[in-house]
């Protein structure tokens, strides 16, 4: 205001000076013209009096105006002070800092080579400066490394975004890293949210082929010796499962006819056994040509040549398969390379197309199928969830619409004192909690609802203690095909849905019934199971184990195949072949009397 007043005053003083000069000039001219000195003095005196009078008059009229403007300025200043709210900063405490920032998304921006983490806060946190920082962590880190450098910075705001490079297929790739938003407090980084992973690796995929649609849920665990004999065509198979023990495909080839395949991923070159890969090429290409949707099961078998794949807490035991190693860089890097290699090779038809990938086998059974020293449920579930995320990101970054599944058996909610296994219900809840908190991804469930016990082919006749274990309650101890709806009902709970609000994909990737209790009973059990699965809209496939009896299983009392080892087709063969065809009732009518029903609706719930 003072500057504005000064400019106004200088302007009026200039006018007065010009007036005085003008009068003086007139006077001098008049004196010169009249030739009288007295006249000049008189005019000069009158000019001085006029100037003094103007000055006095101006000051008298100007003073009220100045006072008025000062009053207006003070009023404006007071109004501005009243309307401007002071910035409020919230002090960070141990209680509020863990979830101070709410993360909306952490996603790759297609075609940009970058990812963006979007987040918000209710109020700005107090800290050393006015910035939010994005920091990178390893998958196995449990706390922030204070020596880390921020990879992105943004001024504090209630809604903000942080952007950094994905560094795709580079030594410093961030596809398997997790990220936190932090502030500096007393010179140290303080994380303000749960670690977050990139959730849309499919944005990197060159292959965007749609997931295949099938007319039937019918599938089989295939016998590789029967791929070319026409049996799969005769059976009308729509889905097939095949195992891939990972250590078997790694390492250089010893057979010169099948050269080693070298594959560089994230700056590291890996050797894949050319002969083993050729075998999978053969299987997957034939199945693809037949229009069959393929499910590959990634198994972590132990090999002295590939110790990095075995979790540090799993190296002391003996089991069929072991927990994947997400606790060390070498394990994560190898898993990621395997996932990327397989998904890239089996995506576009040249070597076959695999669209379903299962991570491990019945991983809730810690002692046999996913060995790790006993740990609490949260620790165990986190290690497995991390393995699923590594394969999810590596596979979907190569094949955008591939699906990745967790694998569970039928022990739903047993609450056993034994430490050999964890309940499936508890495992699913914990995996979901961990994954949702750190960046929800679209994992699916590959379930194994075998009869209980496994050799109980006529499961509908169960009684006593066994019957009490199998109920329609969500707290049932065991899930079989009698109560499979318990699983899909559970997955419909709001907290279990995908980020898009969808029910997660479900496949019954392994179940079967032994013919040692009678081939007709085996066929009746299959018919029951198939109709139960087919009536459930959330089940995408039912894969029967198996096409041919396995010697090691028969020795345990489980002859699960459609055919014997000698090649003789069992009674179940024609039932399997025709159950999804017109006139199927002709082949399944026999089962009603065996089960003791007049209509399938008596045992198959309407969904």
Segment roles from a protein language model:
Residues 111-126:
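Aromatic/hydrophobic beta-strand junction motif of beta-rich domains
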Residues 238-416, 452, 549-557:
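Substrate-binding cleft and catalytic face of glycoside hydrolase catalytic domains
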Residues 1-79, 83:
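Gram-positive cell-envelope targeting signals
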Residues 123, 165-167, 192-248, 253-254:
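Boundary/entry segment of secreted carbohydrate-active catalytic domains
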Residues 258-260, 317-318, 347, 368, ...:
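Aromatic-rich peripheral "rim/lid" segments of glycoside hydrolase catalytic domains that contact
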Residues 229, 335-338, 350-355, 379-520:
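Noncatalytic carbohydrate-binding groove/subsite architecture in carbohydrate-active enzymes
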Residues 172-191:
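Short, aromatic- and glycine-rich surface loops/edge beta-strands on solvent-exposed regions
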Residues 85-111:
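Short, compositionally biased P/S/T/A/G/V-rich stretches that sit at domain boundaries
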């Amino acid at each position: 205001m003072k500057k504005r007043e000064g400019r106004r005053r200088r302007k009026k003083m200039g006018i007065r000076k010009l007036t005085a000069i003008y009068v003086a000039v007139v006077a001098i001219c008049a004196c010169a013209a009249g030739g009288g000195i007295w006249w000049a003095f008189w005019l000069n005196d009158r000019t001085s009096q006029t100037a003094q009078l103007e000055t006095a008059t101006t000051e008298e009229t100007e003073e009220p105006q100045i006072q008025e403007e000062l009053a207006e300025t003070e009023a404006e200043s007071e109004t501005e002070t009243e309307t401007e709210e002071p910035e409020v900063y919230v002090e960070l405490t141990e209680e509020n800092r863990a979830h101070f920032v709410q993360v909306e998304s952490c996603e790759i921006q297609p075609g940009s080579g970058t990812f963006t983490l979007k987040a918000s806060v209710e109020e700005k946190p107090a800290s050393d400066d006015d910035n939010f920082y994005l920091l990178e962590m390893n998958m196995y880190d449990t706390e922030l490394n204070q020596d880390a450098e921020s990879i992105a910075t943004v001024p504090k705001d209630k809604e903000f975004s942080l952007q950094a490079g994905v560094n795709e297929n580079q030594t410093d790739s961030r596809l398997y890293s997790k990220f936190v938003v932090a502030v500096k407090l007393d010179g140290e980084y303080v994380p303000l949210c749960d670690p977050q992973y990139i959730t849309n690796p499919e944005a990197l995929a060159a292959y965007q082929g749609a997931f295949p649609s099938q007319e039937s849920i019918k599938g089989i665990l295939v016998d590789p010796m029967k791929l070319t004999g026409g049996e799969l065509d005769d059976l009308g198979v729509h889905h097939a499962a095949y195992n891939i023990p990972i250590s078997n495909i790694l390492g250089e080839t010893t057979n010169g006819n099948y050269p080693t395949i070298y594959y560089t991923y994230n700056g590291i070159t890996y050797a894949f056994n050319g002969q083993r890969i050729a075998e999978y090429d053969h299987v997957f290409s034939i199945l693809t040509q037949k229009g069959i949707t393929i499910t590959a099961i990634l198994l972590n078998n132990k090999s002295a040549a590939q110790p990095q794949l075995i979790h540090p807490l799993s190296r002391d035991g003996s089991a069929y398969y072991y927990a994947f190693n997400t606790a060390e860089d070498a394990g994560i890097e190898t898993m990621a390379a395997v996932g990327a290699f397989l998904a890239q090779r089996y995506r576009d038809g040249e070597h076959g197309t695999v669209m379903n990938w299962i991570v491990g086998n019945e991983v809730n059974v810690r002692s046999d199928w996913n060995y790790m020293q006993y740990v609490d449920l949260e620790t165990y579930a986190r290690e497995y969830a991390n393995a699923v995320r590594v394969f999810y990101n590596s596979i979907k970054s190569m094949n955008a619409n591939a699906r990745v599944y967790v694998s569970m058996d039928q022990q739903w909610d047993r609450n056993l004192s034994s430490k050999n296994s964890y309940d499936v219900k508890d495992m699913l809840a914990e995996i979901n909690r961990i994954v949702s908190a750190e960046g929800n991804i679209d994992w699916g469930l590959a379930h194994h609802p075998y009869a209980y016990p496994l050799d109980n082919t006529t499961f509908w006749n169960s009684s006593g203690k066994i019957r009490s274990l199998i109920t329609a309650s969500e707290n049932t101890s065991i899930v079989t095909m009698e109560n499979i709806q318990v699983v899909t009902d559970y997955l419909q709970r709001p907290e279990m849905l995908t980020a898009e609000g969808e029910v997660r994909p479900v496949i019954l990737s392994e179940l079967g019934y032994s013919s040692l209790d009678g081939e007709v009973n085996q066929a009746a059990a299959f018919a029951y199971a198939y109709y139960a699965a087919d009536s459930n809209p959330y089940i995408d496939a039912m894969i029967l184990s198996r096409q041919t009896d396995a010697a090691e299983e028969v020795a345990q009392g489980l002859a699960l195949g459609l055919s014997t080892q000698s090649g003789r087709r069992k009674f179940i063969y024609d039932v399997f072949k025709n159950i999804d065809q017109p006139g199927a009732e002709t082949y399944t009518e026999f089962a009603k009397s065996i089960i003791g029903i007049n209509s399938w609706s008596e045992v198959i719930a309407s969904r």
